[in-house]
Amino acid sequence: MPTINQLVRKPRVSEVIKSKSPALENCPQRRGVCTRVYTTTPKKPNSALRKVAKVRLTNGFEVISYIGGEGHNLQEHSVVLIRGGRVKDLPGVRYHIVRGSLDLQGVKDRRQARSKYGAKRPKAA
């Protein structure tokens, strides 16, 4: 336990909390332009072709973000909205693209968890 005199000379320093999504700069979402849309393979126990996009944000950052859901209409120069949230089996992917916003359409024929994929409510049969 330090003395009061020691604390006067050298005060306690609180730990700096590192952001998990630094490119957002404390904003909930950020807009950006796709520079490359491609597929990549996940880490060891899993196997798939995951859809990702390299996005240049309005604040100058260039990040890799994940395109969730089945099928998408993204290509180079598409304007997208990104949010935080990493993909555990894709190293370096720390952001998600918001479905149904700006140039990215919602998932077609989606019935459950629609709000997460930008899908409108289906017409009652």
Curated annotation (Swiss-Prot):
Q: Which residues carry this modification: 3-methylthioaspartic acid?
A: 89
One of the GO biological process terms: translation
Which Gene Ontology molecular-function terms are recorded? rRNA binding; structural constituent of ribosome; tRNA binding
Task: Say yes or no: keyword Ribonucleoprotein present.
Answer: yes
* Record note on quaternary structure: Part of the 30S ribosomal subunit. Contacts proteins S8 and S17. May interact with IF1 in the 30S initiation complex.
Assigned protein family: Belongs to the universal ribosomal protein uS12 family.
The molecule here is called Small ribosomal subunit protein uS12
Species of the source: Cupriavidus metallidurans (strain ATCC 43123 / DSM 2839 / NBRC 102507 / CH34) (Ralstonia metallidurans)
